[in-house]
Amino acid sequence: MRVSEFWRLMDEEFSPSYSRVLARDLVLAGVGGNTASEALRAGFDPKEIWHEVCKMQDVPPSRWLGRDVSPKN
């Protein structure tokens, strides 16, 4: 997963403004006790970070992949 995909999923699930608050403040045990922002800077896999955020925020697994995006023509 690219970092841009991580942010797209965060924005879709939590809204653009609240996703930044979560990334800055929510401590994720699964990525070394870092916040999502810290974990991204430290080089953790964005997909791993996304899954940790989903677990901590009780996002249903059915929404972990986000919504379908149509390919550009």
Predicted regions and their residues:
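C-terminal alpha-helical interaction appendages
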Residues: M1-N73
